[in-house]
Amino acid sequence: MNKKLLLFVFIGAMNIKAIGQAPKIDTVAVSILDRMSAIIGDLSSCSVTIKSNYDINSRELGLVKHSNEHELYLHGPNKLLVKSEGDKGSHILSYNGKTLTYYSRDKNQFGLIPSQASVVDMIDSVNKMYGIEFPGADFFYPTFVDDILAESKNLVFIGITKVGDKDCFHIAGTAKDKTFQFWISDDAFYLPMKMVIVHTAKENNPQFEAVFTNWKINPDLPDAMFEFNAPPNAKKIKMVAKTIKK
């Protein structure tokens, strides 16, 4: 084998490797996610039950599985109610478009956070300032698909599979520090039915899984259900912003 042929083989091998490492963004997967995001964005109201499981690293036990269940109600651009039960305790998040109330059923304590933003903007600011988590919030962001594409190394449509008895589009992807999978209902509404995230940059690769059930589209949700009425003897506490590292 002469030098020219050796050089050709070497360069060809490099090109094959480079092609193999190139990001793969499946247009079918993007189209499904775009459709889901557009439908959710057009909803005037909705409700859904979210069951989540997540891993926490233990020095003695390795990954320990925890779980929570949430009932979420969304109305218009600025009303949200989330009732949560599970390993993180029992609490309620209630937003009436003017004030977010965090109520701990376990401690019978509540705190108030003033806000007059849309639900999405409120979630974003409250999460950054106070570290409060809102289940399923990612799917309600109008930039959901753009955010996924911005960090994805790969995004592919795998095929049709089932979540419970529901046929779903199965989509999987990878990013720098995680892998993720979405199951989107194969029907007229294209609603999220399940998601799994594996944090590959963290010790032991902890996972987060959420299953969405009991979707109700555009239900009649009265404004009164988003108003918080303090239970008897409930104590009002001050909400303390988390320390931001410089």
Question: What label would you give each PLM region?
Answer:
Residues 1-25:
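Bacterial Sec-dependent N-terminal signal peptides
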Residues 20, 24, 48-51, 101, ...:
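Gly/Pro-enriched, hydrophobic low-complexity segments
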Residues 63, 150-152, 173-176:
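Short loop/turn motifs at secondary-structure junctions and domain boundaries
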